[in-house]
Amino acid sequence: MGQETEISKRYQVAKERYQAIGVDTEKALKTLKDIKISMHCWQGDDVKGFLNPDGELTGGIMATGNYPGAAHTPKQLRQDLEKAYSLIPGKHKLNLHAIYVDTDEKVDLNEIEPKHFTPWVEWAKEQGLGLDFNPTFFSHPMFKDNYTLASPDKEVRDFWIEHGKRSRKISEYFGKELGQTSINNFWVPDGIKDCPIDRYTPRKRLMEALDEVFAEKLDEKYTQEAVESKLFGLGAEAYTVGSHEFYMGYGITRDKLICLDAGHFHPTEVISNKLSSLALFSKGVMLHVSRPVRWDSDHVVIMDDELIEIGRELVRNDLLGITNIGLDFFDATINRIAAWVVGTRNTQKSLLKALLEPTADLKKMELENDFTSRMAITEELKDFPFGDVWNYFCEINGVPVGLDWLKEVKAYEKDVLLKR
């Protein structure tokens, strides 16, 4: 009996078990296939980019490790991404930062244009991918005194305002060329190391600068903007201008998506608990699925409680339609392609786990105060053959099942990465 027959056979058994509790596995698999994950380019080169790859990584973030094989050119990065996507079921998106320009021109962040990203667009067309975007408000000499858009220096603010405006045009270009809405996410690391006297004025400057960046109305068929908060970063421990409250207020009043990064809050605070509230009041959500270990460490996403809870919240509350799921982690201590594959597949698995729940029945039990049945069923579900459904999903989408993907990554490492 071949592996394919065995996987299909095990799936049929699992299908019947789920059917017995009212879950349609075929419907779950169809829904999962339609969910695009926005995989981040910066895992592939440790957030160096191609604008100034030898420059310092600033903005209060840090990539640690020196595992061999990091990409040094756009061509190498695309080659690595192709390998990763070939091991992940479904068709997805790539999330680009502005520093990942692909051009022979000497260009600065306040000069970037769509043409500097044309090779990415042509490649995305060939691969059947969408593209999301991020202006890069860090790793640049104009990141002065820990400030960009909130700087008291008008010259600094104006530089970054221009960068933000140009980023919007690039995101719009992606959407027009690829026929998929490009999400353009604004994260600004501005902050202060020690306790400030004036918390209000920098936030007012940031608000006014963002208003100027977003002044021109763009067609949301092509691009939508998200704004991302953060609690603190290295060198900005006491105060971050773009706090959660700031961007929640800004996003709701300016009709922007609100980006929630799993690592950008207090260590005991989780973004899964925020989704239902934001869904009531905001236009929609951009997720940066990450794994904070004691701080915003951007560890690779594993199948932990919070990832499972994020999947549940999105599915149980029917939020998939207003949520854009992206990843944000960068670990230079392990094979970078493996990092992409593990993180993306785990995010998909968390969604599948949630899609395999009898959600309507569980909600009915809860409404009727039948908490006994609710507990019994949710606990029993933990032992259901979820893995057999996932393996079948991988098989029908033509990607390796189980750990077979690791063999391919190891071979690629030997043949390609270790020769760089």
From Swiss-Prot:
Report the source organism.
Listeria innocua serovar 6a (strain ATCC BAA-680 / CLIP 11262)
Q: A single Pfam family, by name?
A: RhaA
According to its UniProt entry, what is the function of this protein?
A: Catalyzes the interconversion of L-rhamnose and L-rhamnulose.
Tell me the InterPro entries matching this sequence.
L-rhamnose_isomerase, Rhamnose_isomerase, Xyl_isomerase-like_sf
- Catalytic reactions on record: L-rhamnopyranose = L-rhamnulose
Name listed for the protein in its UniProt record: L-rhamnose isomerase
Q: How is the cofactor bound?
A: Binds 1 Mn(2+) ion per subunit.
Instruction: For this entry, list what GO says about its biological process.
Output: L-lyxose metabolic process; rhamnose catabolic process
Signal peptide limits: none
Q: Which HAMAP family does the record match to this protein? A: RhaA
> Where, per UniProt, does this protein localize?
Cytoplasm
Q: List required co-factors.
A: Mn(2+)
The uppermost taxa in this organism's lineage are: Bacteria, Bacillati, Bacillota, Bacilli, Bacillales
Q: Which family does it belong to?
A: Belongs to the rhamnose isomerase family.
User: Which Gene Ontology cellular component annotation is one that this UniProt entry carries?
Assistant: cytoplasm
Disulphide bonds annotated for this chain are: none
Q: Which UniProt keywords apply?
A: Cytoplasm, Isomerase, Manganese, Metal-binding, Rhamnose metabolism
Q: Binding positions for Mn(2+)?
A: 264, 296, 298
Q: In which pathway does it act?
A: Carbohydrate degradation; L-rhamnose degradation; glycerone phosphate from L-rhamnose: step 1/3
Which EC class heads this enzyme's classification? Answer: isomerase
GO molecular function terms noted in the UniProt entry:
L-rhamnose isomerase activity; manganese ion binding
Electron transport as a keyword?
A: no
Q: EC number(s) per UniProt?
A: 5.3.1.14
The gene behind this protein is: rhaA
